[in-house]
Amino acid sequence: MEQTKALNALEPFIVLSKSATSPRAAADLVTRVTSAPNTFIFTELLQTPQIQSLEYSHEFSSYLTLLQIFSHGTYADYIANASALPALNDDQKLKLRQLSLLTLVANDGSNVPLDYDAMQRENNQAQPPNQSYASLTRRLELSSARELEELVISAIYAGLIEGQLDPANEMVQINSVAALRDVPARGVNGLLSSLQGWAGRCQATLQELEATMANLRDEADRRATEEQEWNNKMSQLLEDEQKGAVPSSSSSSLPFSWFNNTRGGGGGGDGAGAGGSFRGSGYSRGGGLSQGYRSSQRGSHQQHQNQSRQQQNHHHHHQSNQSGTNSLLTSGGGSYLSFREGPSAVSPSAAAGLMGSSTSFAALGGMETGSGSGSGPLGKRGSSDMDDSEEDIDDDTMDLDDEGDETKRGSKRKLTA
């Protein structure tokens, strides 16, 4: 913004330079432009042919040197060549001292023209160093601290610097400086170096950002691939589980096999499920105590089936008990061992009432074991076969009764005859 104001203030003098056809007119233009307020840059005016022609004028060539000092020199440069230069009015002295203050604080107090080291320090986020009253008063050819304070205040209002005065410590605290000094020819190389360094830092920053973005994209792709593989595995596992699931609605549809080894006697047992337990014992006509244990993967469902079968077995025991016992399985005595896997407990050997000891194996889905002597609970086949046996006994009894009646009637006929 300050540069725009300075360029706008210089523009009228550039237009006037076109009409300054004589060295005197050009020299007068130099005096006016260096005395005008808000004109702090003069390069464009220096490059005009009319101003450059002053170099060949023996009488007015000093005005060209004076304009060059205002462009990129200091007040000390003017004092060093004051005898060969035109005298300065009060406005010119104030302006040259303001520009010199800008150069001094920007260049760390060294009495050299501004070469845009301030730009480099701004890029490095460094503040110009503070200046003492004594140093600035001496370099700017001022007579008192009061004059220095007035100069600093005018430079702050002109937008050349930002800072504060510290009268107690006699220090000028500089916060920032404006780029309102022209670049001399000898300062171009330094400016190019600063710009190249700034461009290099920008390029390095861009490369780091691109590398970081590439790493983030690779990481995102890797995570997406892992997630897709995981989803595929889970889908395949679910599909395999559905295809390989065993239906449990009906036990008759499952594979079923028996292996029996009978060595006399009969046996039985009871059951214990995952959801609870049931234990019982009974005596048959052959004598003996049966006790068994059952484990099942079906929990309370198996327990319910065991209790139902136990009730059925007690019912059949009551019907077929002929010796005062409360359960009937097989006739005879011996030992019985049964291993069974499946949702139901059916022991063919116990149901059939085989003589001797019996060992049975069944493979289906759960597991049942039983051991003991004497009798245990009947399965469906046992109860069915026992009912058939009872019916046969009843038929035989009825046949004997019929034969007895027939014998009585025959004897009675003989006596009558």
Curated annotation (Swiss-Prot):
The lineage of its organism: Eukaryota, Fungi, Dikarya, Ascomycota, Pezizomycotina. Keywords: Cytoplasm, Nucleus, Signalosome. Its main location: cytoplasm. Component of the COP9 signalosome (CSN) complex. Residues 240-417 are annotated as: Disordered. GO terms for cellular component: COP9 signalosome; cytoplasm. Residues 263-290, 367-379 have a biased composition (Gly residues). It is found in: Cytoplasm; Nucleus. Residues 385-405 have a biased composition (Acidic residues). The keyword Nucleus applies. Belongs to the CSN7/EIF3M family. CSN7 subfamily. Pfam families: CSN7_HB_subdom (PF22061), PCI (PF01399). It comes from Neurospora crassa (strain ATCC 24698 / 74-OR23-1A / CBS 708.71 / DSM 1257 / FGSC 987). This is COP9 signalosome complex subunit 7a. Residues 291-311, 320-330, 343-352 have a biased composition (Low complexity). Component of the COP9 signalosome (CSN) complex that acts as an regulator of the ubiquitin (Ubl) conjugation pathway by mediating the deneddylation of the cullin subunit of SCF-type E3 ubiquitin-protein ligase complexes. The CSN complex is involved in the regulation of the circadian clock through its control of the stability of the SCF(FWD1) complex. Residues 2-179 form the PCI domain. InterPro entries: COPS7/eIF3m (IPR045237), PCI_dom (IPR000717).
